Design a protein with these regions (language model features):
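Detector for methionine-enriched segments
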Residues: 1, 47-48, 106, 114, ...
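Extreme N-terminal leader/anchor segments
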Residues: 1-97, 108, 321-390
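Residue-identity detector for threonine
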Residues: 2, 24, 28, 34, ...
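Residue-level recognition of tetratricopeptide repeat
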Residues: 112-115, 167-169, 201-204, 238-239, ...
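Canonical tetratricopeptide repeat
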Residues: 116, 172, 207, 242-244, ...
Length: 390
């Protein structure tokens, strides 16, 4: 990708083609969906077991077992989401037919915890579908009762999975998802996440989720968030260094001004360096660079102390991009603008990626504005940054 202005320097940076990586995730979901449609539940279970045991992940760190399970229940969940959003009279078969069939499959495989897990996860998804985006005050009684019923059914099923698969990350993650859904003030939240992290310490996603759910708006407090971030750094120091602190705070400080204001920013920045030292791949480089350049700027101007922290983190984008970046990953930058919110619906992956590329190029041009204005070409190469006269 080359960008230039007349009589100015050029910005040259390769743009990664992430279609193959994205296709892998989509194909995994589709495989789970196909196996469920064909009633090949034994094979689905075997594949989920293998992926879970190997801690296999997609390029964005989503566990492969999660993708298979998502595909297997997607027809059921999407049918209910469509029925609830259609606006016409609700049909009980549309709302209950699919999950009843899943329950029947579970009863036909009573000794298979992975199939039970798929059913439990479907109930959690259906609970959220009924919950929607309404506030507690505006949630209709029917929606409230159905939401609670699905969460309760998931809570009934998960102990069987945990007893059969005590060392399974996907089962532990489901337990955390259930706690998040039930929204009960509970000391077990940090304990459940600690357990999940101990089962899969190389995956940052549970650490980030724990930080979010330890905010006061969920189950925790600012004090608990800081304590757990420090504890996580101590527990995972051999893998992440100070990065264990950074991952727990990563999404929390982007969401909450007070959490950001209270951050130990020097330790957070040390964690960024430790993460890149251990994960120097361009996926990670782009994610951390986009976070510092774009995500952390959201909410600027709402809290003076938080703004100071944000500016220090934002400045880190300079060295991350200059010292570590060799190629641009547009989808990562697009997600950064949404705060890496996985619930955001993407209608067109192409337009979403194009927006990410525009945001990234704007941020990088701004970073090198003096060099470009002076006629210097800025070129990113596999061996590092190269500056040359235009």
């Amino acid at each position: 990708m080359t960008a230039s202005l007349p009589d100015k320097g050029q910005l040259n940076i390769p743009v990664a083609d992430n279609r193959a990586e994205d296709l892998t995730a989509r194909n995994t979901i589709e495989e789970g969906r196909t196996l469920a449609r064909q009633d090949r539940w034994a094979k689905l279970s075997k594949m989920m077991h293998a992926a879970d045991k190997d801690r296999a992940i997609a390029s964005d760190a989503t566990p492969i077992a999660d993708l298979l399970a998502f595909g297997a229940r997607s027809d059921v969940v999407l049918a209910v989401e469509h029925a609830l959003s259609d606006g016409s009279a609700l049909c009980e078969y549309d709302l209950l037919g699919g999950i009843s069939e899943l329950e029947d499959e579970m009863r036909e495989h009573p000794s298979d915890p992975m199939i039970t897990l798929v059913v439990a996860l479907a109930h959690i998804d259906l609970a959220w579908a009924w919950r929607g985006t309404a506030t507690d005050a505006t949630l209709p009684p029917l929606h409230r009762s159905r939401c609670a019923a699905h969460f309760d059914r998931a809570a009934d099923l998960l102990p069987t999975c945990r007893a059969a698969l005590p060392d399974s990350p996907i089962v532990a993650a489901a337990s955390c998802a259930l706690l998040a859904g039930q929204r009960k003030t509970n000391q077990r939240v940090a304990e459940e996440y600690e357990r999940l992290i101990s089962l899969d310490p190389h995956n940052q996603r549970p650490m980030r989720a724990m930080g979010t759910h330890l905010l006061p708006r969920w189950f925790g407090s600012y004090e608990k968030l800081e304590v757990q971030a420090l504890r996580n750094a101590a527990r995972t120091g051999d893998i992440w260094g100070a990065g264990g602190y950074t991952w727990v705070q990563f999404d929390a400080i982007a969401l909450d001004e007070e959490a950001c204001a209270r951050l130990d920013v020097e330790y957070f920045l040390e964690g960024l360096d430790d993460i890149l030292h251990r994960r120097p791949d361009q996926q990670t480089v782009n994610m951390l660079s986009a976070y510092c350049a774009i995500t952390i700027q959201n909410g600027q101007g709402l809290n003076e102390k938080a703004d100071l922290v944000r500016s220090q983190i934002h400045e880190a984008a300079n060295r991350l991009i200059r010292d570590h970046m060799t190629e641009l990953h547009p989808l990562i930058w697009a997600h950064a603008a949404n705060g890496f919110n996985n619930s955001v619906r993407i209608n067109s992956a192409e337009r979403f990626a194009a927006r990410g590329k525009r945001d990234a190029l704007r941020a990088i041009r701004d970073l090198f504005r003096e060099e470009l204005r002076s006629g210097t070409d800025v070129t990113f190469t596999p061996s590092g940054l190269r500056l040359s006269q235009h």
